[in-house]
Amino acid sequence: AAPERRVVLAALGPKMLALSAAHADGALPYNVTPEHTARARGIVGPGKAIYVEQKICLTEDAAVAREVAAKQLAMYLVLPNYRNCWLRLGFTEEDLSGQGSDRFLDAMVAWGSEATIRARLQAHFDAGADHVAIQPFDPAGGTSPDWNALAVFAPGD
């Protein structure tokens, strides 16, 4: 038998989330917080899948983590769909100005100890996510994924 295949919509706002509930197998929100995941679950309902993405940076140095976060989020800060989503989540224009406030950067990129990052991933599951995809940023600022973080959070076999 053929494997089950699901088609989900990339969805941030309430209209796209409702569309994903009505016409797809679920939603894939990107650049979101666990609070957004809870809102998304409320809109798409219990019978649809929610696959979220969470950026991570395995470092306990706040300055390093925020520098990496600011670099990685810069291209999204100018896009209206993401800005509107973040404003709906309670961020302010001030939070989204420049490279983003510490509050914004900390909300978008989980950083800290392994336990701290695992708690953020769990917060998405607790909020209704079916799957959480991690995007591990290199604390050294490299363009490749942080292979150490992958070994910790997605060890495979």
Regions found by a protein language model. Give the residues of each.
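Active-site-adjacent structural elements that line small-molecule/cofactor binding pockets in enzymes
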Residues: 1-157
